[in-house]
């Protein structure tokens, strides 16, 4: 494979993303369970809240200023900012300090992630659906390794965990730097056809205009709601499992979810056909999420239902995430929008959902503890998932009429 080929460049990006996601997966369950047991579920959720608050601010800036999604130095620098901020967590004991540093790390993530996705879209002749599926696969492969490492290491070695995490982010920055150099060289070497004002030079030309312009706002709002709900297990599993299923390692459910995605993502991505197929996959993803929450509400202290719920949660992401990316990208293409800014806008709404959802999850878990009804932390999200599905179905029916 030629070092300048788009496929090679995509693999560089995917390798870097896998390193970063592995680092995040390595520390998150360990830190959340440690803080949750030592302080409260609200403080544990506050760390994710701070992370997503920073991502929200970063993605907002990236959606307004193209330098953050186009310039190699800005993308690489913000990756290093995130890694350095996370490393400093190894030396902070106060939960408020952890929240503050998590916010700074989130800022770096929110500024760099849209640029990474935009870089993928600048690759010549690459199929967009496969690129997004490959990105999801890289994220999950890294997460699988990170969760497995976390299960083996445990929460008593956090300095070592964060040292490894820093090295992984340095690796991500290096791979992204190499990839961006290749993309910049390709943009110079390949003459560009005239493009619409505001579109991204060098982006993959095969992205279909699968979503009419009027769908964008509805998709972004639904995406915020979806991630509001999807973030619930990230918080609640870390708090629920040590208390109610103590025989199960806290990272196991995350690992099961990740391995399921790895096994199915590329196969499932080939199935949808056109806009209708991708919209159907969004609905299937929401149904799987609701089923996962309902299973957890009935799980009690049994291991098997917890693992089944982890598989269902994985299926929700397998069906939902790549299809949403394809629909948003298709809409941006149809309207001649800057892809980098569009990706940043999508990330803004996603982080808004995750930020508010993480705080809600921690507060809901604490309330469930006070009431002595642990199922409350799962039955409320299950009901909300069905409400989201109904709203989406009604919206799509209205558009057809």
Spans of features found by a protein language model:
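Helix-to-loop junctions at the C-terminal end of transmembrane segments
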Residues: 57-70, 154, 263-278, 365-366
